[in-house]
């Protein structure tokens, strides 16, 4: 890529560079104005390539920028880069506008900093843009510490690239944000990248992170002019060029933030299907493709069986080049579809006369002295039926211990991550939400507690019992516990994607944020495997629900279904009345707002059936 870059030049020199470079077919991909607005300095990066018509402006005040904006947007141009420096009453602006930007867009300058609920704040417009399926293209932070201001541009986001903004960080807190954001999964197990890092004159950072792909990249911040030049030379020698350079401050106090890469235009995604094609069920492929491309989903599987015979097993990938192509045998996090394995395990222990539905769980586990005497009356079957006295929902306690494992460990004074029995001990010390057997309220914890009972009775881990007693005899191989930590994940496990972050339930001494899919959601998969933490292929689910109830305990349950949702997973398994069992697993539950087809369409099983659903295809296509 032929490029030209400079920094620290005056407005006059920038204009000279503009005249020379634009005449040679270069166009700006990065522009920054910084320092004293009466003597603003400029940094810019130009690349030599064809593109739409464009115009630029620099050194204008707020009114001048608004006039330029009004004039050129009326001619079909849209801002793509905006930068500003100075206090609100004397700020100057620099910007680049392009023609032919498709879709809706949003641009504002002079935005204040404040709560999302307050109109005219940057934070408010960030949320407004995200809710409108827009993505930030450029941002500037200017003003003063007591009167912070922002300018920004958002464009349409049809591919639903995930993005986050950190409005105002010191250098140290930006580094903390950087360390957390770049651990988030997407294209790879750790995929988010800094896409834009703006710097104010008092060296506050406004950063944008995205999960799109520009190949290898390097980011630096807090650089003096000479340090930036040294870094530039080193990266250039390694085949990188700056794709975003932003300055802040004046004279010797100037500092730069820079991002280097080998491409500035994010890679496009490609559609891939694996598994044996079934021409009569090609409509299923079309339904999955429409759903995944509309919602930015990189990986999913769909499997269909009839009377225990596999009829369709396909894996789908909508991802950038280099992403590991999803295979039909890959394991996806199951979320609550894990619960069917717990139910089958308990049923097998009923059949072996090692448990009865009336077995009281806490006495069996050796617990005594409950905070609520009713706890000792909870039976194993009540746990399976969500009648054990626990209500994780807001209508009850609103406390779901399966997602609060760090909190529980700290509350118990533990120096190690919790076990199933630790979580049970904590809940044994709390009052119930209702008398066991008198109500039906969904409870993840009830299944974790039942899993502890399975371990007690079998004297082995929950999943080892499931594997040896249920899976291996049936020849089902594509089920396992999904390791919580990214370091434990393997190539046959789909990359679970979620934007969430919080503190780790495993590293109790650390206050750093970790991705939700690596424990930041508060759950340790190895502890919550009976309720949430298993992984399997869609094919394995169809094998299992032919033999065991998809909902409840017992044999195949015709007309029943089970869904699952947790950070990094959306799943559904269905046993139909016509002998068809099907399952779909998706590697995320992060969805764009107000788009169609939605997950509700895809997973629709209730009349009226959506024509965009898997059920519609199965209802209208004979399965031999």
Where are these regions (language model features)?
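Extracytoplasmic/secreted envelope proteins and their assembly/folding machinery
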Residues: 15-18, 66-69, 122-126, 175, ...
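Terminus-proximal functional modules
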Residues: 1-274
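Short active-site loop at a secondary-structure junction
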Residues: 293-303, 322-383, 432-445, 529-532
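Sec-exported extracytoplasmic/periplasmic mature domains
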Residues: 23-26, 77, 134, 187, ...
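Catalytic loop of the DD-peptidase/beta-lactamase superfamily, centered on the K-T-G motif
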Residues: 262-315, 467, 505-624
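Residue-level structural signal for beta-strand termini and adjacent loop
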Residues: 34, 85, 142, 316-317, ...
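Soluble non-cytosolic domains of exported or imported proteins
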Residues: 8, 12, 63, 116, ...
């Amino acid at each position: 890529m032929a490029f030209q870059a400079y920094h620290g030049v005056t407005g006059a020199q920038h204009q000279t560079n503009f005249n020379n470079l634009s005449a040679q077919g270069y166009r700006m991909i990065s522009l920054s104005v910084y320092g004293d607005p009466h003597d603003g300095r400029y940094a810019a990066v130009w690349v030599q390539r064809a593109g739409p018509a464009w115009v630029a402006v620099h050194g204008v005040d707020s009114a001048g920028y608004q006039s330029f904006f009004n004039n050129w947007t009326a001619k079909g141009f849209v801002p793509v880069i905006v930068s500003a420096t100075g206090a609100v009453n004397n700020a100057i602006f620099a910007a680049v506008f392009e023609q032919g930007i498709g879709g809706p867009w949003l641009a504002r300058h002079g935005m204040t900093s404040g709560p999302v609920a307050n109109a005219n704040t940057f934070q408010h417009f960030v949320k407004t843009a995200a809710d409108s399926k827009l993505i930030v293209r450029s941002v500037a932070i200017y003003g003063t510490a007591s009167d912070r201001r922002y300018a920004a541009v958002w464009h349409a986001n049809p591919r639903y690239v995930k993005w986050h903004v950190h409005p105002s960080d010191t250098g140290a807190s930006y580094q903390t944000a950087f360390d957390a954001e770049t651990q988030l999964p997407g294209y790879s197990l750790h995929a988010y990248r800094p896409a834009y890092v703006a710097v104010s004159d008092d060296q506050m950072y406004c950063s944008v992170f995205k999960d799109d792909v520009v190949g290898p990249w390097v980011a630096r911040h807090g650089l003096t002019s000479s340090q930036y030049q040294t870094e530039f030379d080193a990266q250039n020698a390694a085949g990188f060029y700056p794709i975003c350079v932003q300055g802040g401050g004046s004279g010797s106090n100037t500092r730069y933030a820079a991002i280097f890469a080998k491409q500035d235009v994010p890679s496009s995604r490609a559609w891939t299907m694996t598994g044996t094609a079934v021409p009569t069920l090609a409509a299923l492929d079309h339904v999955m493709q429409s759903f995944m491309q509309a919602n930015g989903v990189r990986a999913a599987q769909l499997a269909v069986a009839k009377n225990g015979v596999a009829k369709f097993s396909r894996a789908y990938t909508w991802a950038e080049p280099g992403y590991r192509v999803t295979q039909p045998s890959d394991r996806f996090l199951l979320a609550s579809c894990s619960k069917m394995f717990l139910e089958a395990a308990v049923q097998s222990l009923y059949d072996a006369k090692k448990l009865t539905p009336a077995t009281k769980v806490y006495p069996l586990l050796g617990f005594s002295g409950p905070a609520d005497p009713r706890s000792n009356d909870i039976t194993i079957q009540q746990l399976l039926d969500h009648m054990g006295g626990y209500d994780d929902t807001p209508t009850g306690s609103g406390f779901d211990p399966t997602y609060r494992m760090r909190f529980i460990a700290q509350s118990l004074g533990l120096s190690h991550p919790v076990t199933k029995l630790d979580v049970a001990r904590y809940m044994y010390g709390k009052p119930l939400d209702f008398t066991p057997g008198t109500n039906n309220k969904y409870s993840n914890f009830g299944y974790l507690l039942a899993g502890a009972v399975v371990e007690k009775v079998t004297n082995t881990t929950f999943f080892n019992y499931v594997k040896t007693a249920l899976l291996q005899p049936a020849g089902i191989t594509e089920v396992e516990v999904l390791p919580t930590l990214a370091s434990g994940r393997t190539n046959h496990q789909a990359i679970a994607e979620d934007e969430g972050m919080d503190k780790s339930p495993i590293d109790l001494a650390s206050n750093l944020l970790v991705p939700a899919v690596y424990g930041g959601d508060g759950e340790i998969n190895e502890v919550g495997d009976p309720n949430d933490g298993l992984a399997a292929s869609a094919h394995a689910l169809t094998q299992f629900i032919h033999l065991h109830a998809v909902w409840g305990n017992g044999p195949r349950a015709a007309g029943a279904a089970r869904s699952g949702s947790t950070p990094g997973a959306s799943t559904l398994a269905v046993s139909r009345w016509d002998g068809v069992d099907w399952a779909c697993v998706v590697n995320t539950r992060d969805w764009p707002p107000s788009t169609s087809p939605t997950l509700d369409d895809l997973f629709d099983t209730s009349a009226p059936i959506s024509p965009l659903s898997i059920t519609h295809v199965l209802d209208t296509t004979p399965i031999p």
